[in-house]
Amino acid sequence: AATVPAAVGPGPVAGWPTMSQDRIAEQIAEMSPQQRDRLITEYPRQVGNTDGVPWPMRAAANRINIASAVLTETGADDDSRRRVALYRGLLGEIDDPSGRPGRIERQILAFDPARASLVELNGDLAAARSVAVLVPGVNTRIEDSAANTVTARRFVTATSGDAAVITYLGGPFPQVRDPVDVVTEAADPRYALDMAPRLVAFSEDVDRVVGDGVPVTVIGHSYGGSIVGTAETQGLTSDRTLFLAAAGAGVGVDDPGDWHNRNPTVLRFSMTAPGDFIEAVQGIPGGPHGADPDEMPTVVRLTTGTYDDGGRVAGWPAHSGMLNRPSDAWRTILAVITGDAPALHRAAAVS
């Protein structure tokens, strides 16, 4: 039931690791406001990191967890000082990414540095007409997560709040710092296998929380594509799945029959820029991350087009550029999130 398995403790949270999300939600619904407040203050780690707990409670509990993390840092070295700055930023107010006046608190749905877990909701879920969950790739760490947050907020801003985007760091990602790490880290399926069940559980929670008729898109970028594809084999819940410059379609995925999304009408899309270095590992025979999603039957392949400055979205820089630079590719990603059918029709690759 937990995005990051909550530690077992006494009292009302003791049974959570073995309870369904629905049962956890029911248990909390039966509590008085005073009992809920006490639950947050007495068990912030469990409340802040367990699926089934109402999201406002998770956010409130994680403010306690983040404040505690600040206090545990010594500030004696550069790494500690950077963490303190990051954690204080998580506690601070930000301009509303939807463009509405005023400043708002950040909405942290999971925070556990010991498990490399940080999940943040960007945007107003009550106002959103579409929701996306963004799973990033190699070299992602809590300490370097600000770039993912900026990417997510850009989609919220572009839609004036009609889209909400969740950044999902559900555990450790491969860290590639030199060529050897490409083999020992990026090619290691263990990270995908470990994170996939947590993503499956979180997607179930998203499905329960998001309003009826609001589509949810799960996006896997780079190594995150393997995580998302692996989660699809285990019962991910999404209305749309987007493989973005994905390392593969998922560990052990050879064809669409290996995916078992809980939504039988899920739509799947894939986009990789021409000349992206990820092409060298996509779909290699016996590869650790499964088949190439760009070539999978039933998956709609999308073209990347050009940047707004006129250059083609292609080559190694396009691996992250498609997510972070104004371009046809970026607008197509947004079209997947919002369900803009005409834009997707224009971007669909012709076989």
Task: Give a label for each model feature.
Residues 124-126, 137-214, 232-351:
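Lipolytic serine-hydrolase domain surface
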Residues 116-117, 165:
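Short glycine-rich loop/turn motifs
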Residues 1-116, 122, 126-129:
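Intrinsically disordered, low-complexity charged segments of secreted bacterial virulence
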Residues 219-228:
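Gly/Ala-rich beta-loop-alpha elbow adjacent to hydrolase catalytic centers
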Residues 120, 229-230:
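Contiguous, well-ordered alpha-helical segments that form the cores/surfaces of helical PPI scaffolds
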